[in-house]
Amino acid sequence: MSEIFDAKAFLKTVTSQPGVYRMYDAGGAVIYVGKAKDLKKRLSSYFRSNLASRKTEALVAQIQHIDVTVTHTETEALLLEHNYIKLYQPRYNVLLRDDKSYPFIFLSGDTHPRLAMHRGAKHAKGEYFGPFPNGYAVRETLALLQKIFPVRQCENSVYRNRSRPCLQYQIGRCLGPCVAGLVGEEEYAQQVEYVRLFLSGKDDQVLTQLIARMEKASQDLAFEEAARIRDQIQAVRRVTEKQFVSNAGDDLDVIGVAFDAGMACVHVLFIRQGKVLGSRSYFPKVPGGTELGEVVETFVGQFYLQGSQMRTLPGEILLDFNLSDKTLLADSLSELAGRRIHVQTKPRGDRARYLKLARTNAATALITKLSQQSTITQRLTALAAVLKLPAIKRMECFDISHTMGEQTVASCVVFDANGPLRAEYRRYNIAGITPGDDYAAMNQVLRRRYGKAIEESKIPDVILIDGGKGQLAQAKAVFAELDVPWDKHHPLLLGVAKGADRKAGLETLFFEPEGEGFSLPPDSPALHVIQHIRDESHDHAIGGHRKKRAKVKNTSTLETIEGVGPKRRQMLLKYMGGLQGLRNASVEEIAKVPGISQGLAEKIFWSLKH
């Protein structure tokens, strides 16, 4: 039995300086991370007789040990707190599940600049515009830009090795700088400048310059050129008319909040140069009994301080909630950015409109999320009743994908009480089996997945095996042989056989490989959740298989050539713009690739020809 935490003795050792504290339970897990301007005062508040909330009572009841880290300043404490939250993911902290870097539009610094989507560190020479809320918003913007300003979007490896213009040139979406004589340097540079101005929010300058060029072309009797520029002007106007724009050229993030039924939605609008680049809804994990103020404060800190390496900070942040540590947050962000960042909670004018828009979006997204959660909860409850289980908190499903036995991939998808847990989806490359042996593939993936220690919270209540009796028999055999520290008898193994003509609604379920199967009515909520997880698993497996097949297709020919290892293969494919470009290259062109000698170039050339 663990010892009772002696709060009085501990508090005697605590300093009154700023710092961060970590609370541990009896199992040694960090259950809460907090910061304080005065550590002694803050930590003493946890051990009073009248605690502020049930959440705090539950937290204090589990404390077995507290670690304290003293910092020089409050700002240091704030940064360290969020680093610890990201590292330990404590269950009593509000957690933001968002580790993705945000995409930007990249305009390269090449002689003939190209447009592309970019994520991650900004090492490449060029200009970055954004951030955008997701990849879809970037791809949509790039497609739009390509229609208005025909600047190239191809990779440099493709650009360097073209002798004839590509389809994009033929349909008027690229000026073809890859082929000499198709476009003048001045004309291409002019289109690049239009892109730069457009992405910087200077639409009026773009229109002014285009109108002047159209009038000049008309005066010079170059009517075809004037008509082309007229079409460009109309396209720019159509785009700018649709945008929600502020005349102030605002550069800010707007954060709206909605909170209901223990769930929070934080909606962020990304506004750059007065244009709404897009928005995104976040649903942080909120422990029971948490106040809205703590949700907002923790979210904002994690959103900017944990993701600071990949996130471009705006000049101003508008908040739908008055933070107690607003000044501290602004100072910390300013220190991080190397410039002044303003945090505002009571805006007026256009900014108030932005905040209202963010608030409305947060409320709408929360209603949708609660509705979806209600549906998945009803379906899981129905399935638990069918399977005679008290509840289903976690469910995993497996599927196998291959083409004629080649490039076999197994997928595992995970659902919890709220639906798909995509961060925990996994793919497994299957090797060392007879091609096309799905039973052996299932046997292998289950051993790899479950033949090791598993956290108690991650032991599934139900394991779905897509494939029916044969696959279920493999699963039963694997689990019978497992020698693991967790309860291998806890998961219920359930086989799912596809119906006649593989139609949805005709699935047969099996508890035992040799037993009789049973079906559920097509309108059964329990069947719907089975179909949902089965389809997720199928799509995840096919996606992995296609990636593996494409990779093999591009590299298998080169793998047979002696002297061409992974690095040289990568260099050849990158420099030549793919396998087809390499097949069409001469010996002299291949020899120009870094690391390829004349002799090796000849070997590669003749190997590809035969």
Curated annotation (Swiss-Prot):
User: Record's PANTHER family?
Assistant: UVRABC SYSTEM PROTEIN C, UVRC/OXIDOREDUCTASE
Q: What the protein does? A: The UvrABC repair system catalyzes the recognition and processing of DNA lesions. UvrC both incises the 5' and 3' sides of the lesion. The N-terminal half is responsible for the 3' incision and the C-terminal half is responsible for the 5' incision.
Record's GO cellular component terms: cytoplasm; excinuclease repair complex
Keyword Cell cycle (UniProt): no
Q: List the Gene Ontology MF annotations in alphabetical order.
A: DNA binding; excinuclease ABC activity
Its assembly, as annotated, is:
Interacts with UvrB in an incision complex.
What keywords sit in the KW lines?
Cytoplasm, DNA damage, DNA excision, DNA repair, Excision nuclease, SOS response
UVR domain boundaries: 204-239
Protein name listed in UniProt = UvrABC system protein C
Cross-referenced Gene3D superfamilies: 5' to 3' exonuclease, C-terminal subdomain, GIY-YIG endonuclease, UVR domain, UvrC, RNAse H endonuclease domain
Q: Cite the InterPro entries for this sequence.
A: GIY-YIG_endonuc (IPR000305), GIY-YIG_endonuc_sf (IPR035901), GIY-YIG_UvrC_Cho (IPR047296), Hlx-hairpin-Hlx_DNA-bd_motif (IPR003583), RuvA_2-like (IPR010994), UVR_dom (IPR001943), UVR_dom_sf (IPR036876), UvrABC_protein_C (IPR050066)
Q: Does the keyword Cytoplasm apply?
A: yes
Give the UniProt family note. Belongs to the UvrC family.
SMART domains xrefs: GIYc, HhH1
Q: Which residues form the GIY-YIG domain?
A: 16-94
Localization (cell): Cytoplasm
Biological process GO annotation list?
Answer: nucleotide-excision repair; SOS response
Predominantly, its location class is cytoplasm
Organism's domain of life?
A: Bacteria
